[in-house]
Amino acid sequence: MKSPFTTTVRAVVASIPKGKVATYGQVAALAGHPGAARAVGMVMRTNKDTKAVPCHRVVGSTGALTGYAYGDGVKSKKLMLEREGVTFKGDKIDLSTSGWKPMA
């Protein structure tokens, strides 16, 4: 059985649109737990349904790609994001253009 926190985090991540990313901290805040970025990382690490919960769309606070448990790891994560149209500046995501800005 999943905790209410896990269920909420998964729902937030499921709502990140293709071509956009959210930071771990942003997901934590949207889930009602500001400051719980590391806990969001734990939820993403145990995600088994990457189609319903696109954990590759969750990134570090600076736009840096962080761990990814599938395929070739971060290399696979970057390729998936590029295919979705996410823009990069060097090795980091350009959060000004590809950062998700959900409706308040």
Regions found by a protein language model. Name each.
Residues 1-104:
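Nucleic acid-binding interface residues in structured DNA/RNA-binding domains
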